[in-house]
């Protein structure tokens, strides 16, 4: 251990210094590979997220890039708005019945419906479930938490996969919900393969692109599509939903009443007709909404786990320390987002810090690393931003909420379960819907 450098494993360094983040997670002009030991924990060897080689990853990412570009996300706004409208209907019903809504599950259902529609052309219809299929969300959380364990004890994954299914179901009934996820992904992926090779990508789904004639045959197998489907469903659901539920919780805390009022005032002035659907590009222009979202992304963190990278063809220099080529190096988003030298009083929810920084010409946005950075940055960053902007714009104009048996401890990062998780016993952000404004 030397200052901010920690040899976190015998083969990996962790550097706690936000100014060095862009060096570890460099852009496409500099080669960065993933650590092979890390990607094995995904147990999805054919998915893009498991590709260690920089060049191969670049080719594979190129197949999907256009589906997540700003232009493509703008075109899919009707899909996002459709999911938000269905969620709004459920909130309206809750207002009438007095039902308590688990917003973690509700937002996860919304984002899952969006990504399944975008990826396969048909929605998973999670919003139609009575409890938003919360058991599915819990199963996903459990699956991702197990990756942290498998990272340190990789042999356990092989042992678990060898256990007969009936025994697994007795040991953990949640396995049944995981199998439902696998069944959905497998069915949709196999249907895509059975439709045959797609000649053109335009107007098609993500998985049509992966089954395109330009893709080598050995990469168009059902296994490739199934692995990619698992990762897209997980990545396209949890982090965005967590950011939204975290945002709602902070806005509804009594000490943040002025923040809530300021946000509602800005939204009502910008979009006075609640029956209209503002566009993402319009919502992005609102300074206070943007500040609120930046602060929520900072405090929800995205992935909480380490994401090691290697620079196979160059050595790195951090201050006086030389880091040999091919050494796995990582930095967690939590330490960047909670750095008091960048964000004073980092535990405090304070959107005004972004307003002040903007007026002073400071670019704090460079320190939002919820989606990582560089050539391996989250592919769905544009879709995530669109979902967050559009969902908050709609529900905060049309509904009044009250927290129900929920505190800041239900959103504050307490432990690493691959995604950041709250303290033991937390069941998420729960609300009562007090008023509907349309």
UniProtKB/Swiss-Prot annotation:
Which cofactors does it use?
Answer: heme
Phenotypic consequence of gene deletion: Completely abolishes the production of peniphenone D, penilactone D, penilactone A and penilactone B; but still retains the production of clavatol, hydroxyclavatol, crustosic acid and terrestric acid.
List keywords of the entry alphabetically. Answer: Heme, Iron, Metal-binding, Monooxygenase, Oxidoreductase
Q: GO annotations under biological process?
A: mycotoxin biosynthetic process
Which SUPFAM superfamilies does the UniProt entry name for this protein? Cytochrome P450
Q: GO terms for molecular function, please? A: heme binding; iron ion binding; monooxygenase activity; oxidoreductase activity, acting on paired donors, with incorporation or reduction of molecular oxygen
Under which pathway is this protein filed?
Secondary metabolite biosynthesis
- EC annotation? 1.-.-.-
**Residues bound to heme:** 378
Top-level enzyme category: oxidoreductase
List, alphabetically, the CDD domains matched.
CYP58-like
Q: Which residues form a coiled coil?
A: none
Role? Cytochrome P450 monooxygenase; part of the cla gene cluster that produces clavatol and ortho-quinone methide. The clavatol biosynthesis cluster cla and the terrestric acid cluster tra are both involved in the production of peniphenones and penilactones. The non-reducing PKS claF is responsible for the formation of clavatol from successive condensations of 3 malonyl-CoA units, presumably with a simple acetyl-CoA starter unit, and 2 methylation steps.
- What does the sequence similarity comment in the record state about its family? Belongs to the cytochrome P450 family.
Return the protein name. Cytochrome P450 monooxygenase claJ
Protein source organism: Penicillium crustosum (Blue mold fungus)
In the UniProt record, what gene is named as encoding this protein?
Answer: claJ
């Amino acid at each position: 251990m030397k200052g901010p450098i920690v040899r976190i494993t015998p083969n990996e360094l962790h550097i706690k210094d936000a100014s060095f983040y862009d060096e570890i997670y460099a852009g496409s002009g500099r080669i960065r590979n993933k650590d092979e030991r890390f990607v094995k924990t995904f147990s999805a060897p054919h998915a893009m997220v498991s590709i260690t080689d920089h060049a191969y990853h670049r080719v594979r990412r190129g197949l999907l890039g256009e589906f997540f570009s700003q232009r493509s996300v703008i075109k899919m706004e009707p899909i996002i708005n459709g999911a938000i409208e269905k969620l709004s209907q459920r909130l309206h019903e809750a207002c009438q019945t007095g039902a308590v809504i688990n917003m973690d599950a509700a937002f996860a259902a919304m984002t899952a419906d969006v990504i399944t529609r975008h990826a396969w052309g048909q929605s998973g219809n999670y919003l139609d479930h009575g409890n938003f299929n919360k058991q599915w969300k819990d199963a996903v959380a459990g699956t991702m938490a197990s990756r942290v364990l498998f990272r340190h004890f990789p042999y356990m994954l092989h042992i678990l996969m060898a256990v007969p299914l009936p025994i697994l179901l007795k040991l953990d009934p949640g396995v049944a919900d995981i199998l439902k996820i696998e069944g959905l992904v497998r069915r949709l992926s196999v249907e895509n393969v059975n439709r045959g090779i797609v000649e053109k990508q335009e107007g098609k789904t993500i998985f049509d692109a992966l089954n395109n004639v330009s893709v080598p045959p050995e990469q168009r197998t059902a296994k490739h599509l199934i692995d990619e489907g698992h990762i897209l469903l997980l990545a396209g659901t949890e982090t965005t939903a967590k950011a939204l539920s975290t945002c709602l919780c902070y806005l509804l805390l009594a000490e943040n009443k002025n923040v809530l009022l300021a946000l509602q005032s800005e939204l009502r002035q910008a979009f006075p007709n609640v029956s209209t659907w503002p566009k993402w590009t319009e919502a992005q222009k609102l300074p206070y909404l943007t500040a609120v979202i930046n602060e929520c992304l900072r405090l929800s963190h995205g992935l909480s786990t380490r994401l090691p990278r290697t620079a196979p063809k160059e050595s790195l220099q951090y201050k006086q320390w030389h880091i040999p080529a091919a050494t796995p190096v990582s930095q967690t988003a939590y330490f960047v987002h909670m750095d008091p030298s960048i964000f004073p009083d980092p535990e405090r929810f304070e959107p005004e810090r972004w307003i002040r920084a903007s007026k002073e010409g400071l670019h704090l946005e460079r320190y939002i690393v919820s989606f990582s950075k560089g050539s391996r940055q989250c592919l769905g960053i544009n879709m995530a931003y669109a979902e967050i902007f559009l969902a908050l714009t709609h529900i905060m104009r049309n509904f009044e909420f009250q927290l129900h048996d929920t505190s800041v401890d239900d959103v504050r990062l307490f432990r690493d379960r691959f995604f950041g998780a709250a303290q033991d016993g937390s069941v998420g952000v729960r609300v009562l819907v007090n008023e509907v404004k349309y």
